[in-house]
A protein has these predicted regions:
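Mixed-charge (Asp/Glu-Lys/Arg
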Residues: 1-18, 24-116
């Protein structure tokens, strides 16, 4: 993920916070926290808290690592959490974990401009 961001002209560093965040910036802009979620097959499992409070304005990159007919490909879906809040699905339990499916993120594929 870091290599992909560097290739696209972003400056990247790992956050020193407990969460696995990247800090991304371009030019002289202030660093933006970016959460990265990676799977080999969908859905992505996420916490309800990602869609509430200050996290709602954060950007998440959903990474799908696919292998089809022996060929590896990586797809990136770059989206603001608030844009996916209505797509978050959660079982009828007290578990704070739910999921985001592939159809929910399709329109955000390679949406790198949101980080600029």
């Amino acid at each position: 993920m870091i290599g992909e961001l560097l290739r696209r002209g972003f400056e990247v560093q790992l956050s020193d916070r407990k969460e696995h965040l990247l800090l991304v910036q371009t030019g002289g802009s202030a660093p933006k926290p970016v959460q990265v979620k990676t799977v080999h097959s969908t859905p992505w499992y996420v916490r309800r808290a990602s869609f509430a409070g200050s996290a709602v304005d954060q950007v998440t990159v959903y990474v799908l690592l696919e292998v089809e007919r022996g060929i590896r490909s990586t797809r990136f879906f770059v989206v603001k959490n608030s844009d996916l809040a209505a797509q978050f699905r959660q079982p009828q339990t007290s578990n704070p974990i739910g999921f985001i499916d592939a159809k929910s993120v399709e329109q955000y594929e390679d949406n790198w401009e949101i980080l600029r």
